[in-house]
């Protein structure tokens, strides 16, 4: 498969040959709602194939087809029922926005101070992420998106809520002194298409 990358990794005294698929996630064939599952060293457990995790790591978690986290004691029952279970190690995704810059005739405006007011992030087939706003010399505050929107078609009981849309959040601070970070430590997918911001700027000087 030309979409696969094989990596030989040495961990301690052991060598591991691991594969990364850069194409469509195979998990979409089995999960309820056809969503991907994001785990490091992920393996697929099923009765007709691998039934135990081929490595030892205390951080390993197990995910059922509905996207829920299940204990190790429930894995055998899921496999006996003909379901697929995914196992792997959670990791943290982070993305920090670059500083917004006002431009005129494709040149930055350096005679004004830009203050941010709002951000809007367009997400696609996403189940979880957090937004961290870190203003200089002020406390960090966090907003969390869980995919569960009141009245939304994806908000189904006992199912992972995977949704697409626009998430808006407030940002009050100087553009050059405020860090805005998207973050997710969940196994549920998060994908972002674009973002836009709203603010106001104040001229520091004016020619007479």
What spans do the regions from the language model cover?
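Beta-sheet repeat architectures centered on beta-propellers
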Residues: 1-208
């Amino acid at each position: 498969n030309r979409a696969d990358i094989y990596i030989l990794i040495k961990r301690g005294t052991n060598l591991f040959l691991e594969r990364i698929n850069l194409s469509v996630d195979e998990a979409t064939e089995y999960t309820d709602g056809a969503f991907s599952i994001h785990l490091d060293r992920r393996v697929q457990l099923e009765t007709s194939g691998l039934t135990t995790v081929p490595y030892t790591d205390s951080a390993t978690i197990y995910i059922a087809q509905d996207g829920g986290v299940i204990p190790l004691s429930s894995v055998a029952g899921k496999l006996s029922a003909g379901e697929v279970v995914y196992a792997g190690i959670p990791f943290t995704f982070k993305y920090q926005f670059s500083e917004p810059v006002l431009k005129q005739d494709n040149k930055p405006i350096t005679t004004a101070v830009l203050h941010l007011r709002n951000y809007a992030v367009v997400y696609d087939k996403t189940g979880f992420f957090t937004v961290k706003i870190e203003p200089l010399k002020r406390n960090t505050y966090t907003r969390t998106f869980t995919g569960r929107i009141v009245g939304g078609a994806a908000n189904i009981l006992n199912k992972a809520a995977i949704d697409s849309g626009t998430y808006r959040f407030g940002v009050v601070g100087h553009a050059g002194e405020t860090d805005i970070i998207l973050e997710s430590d969940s196994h549920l997918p998060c994908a972002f298409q674009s973002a836009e911001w709203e603010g106001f700027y104040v001229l520091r000087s004016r020619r007479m």
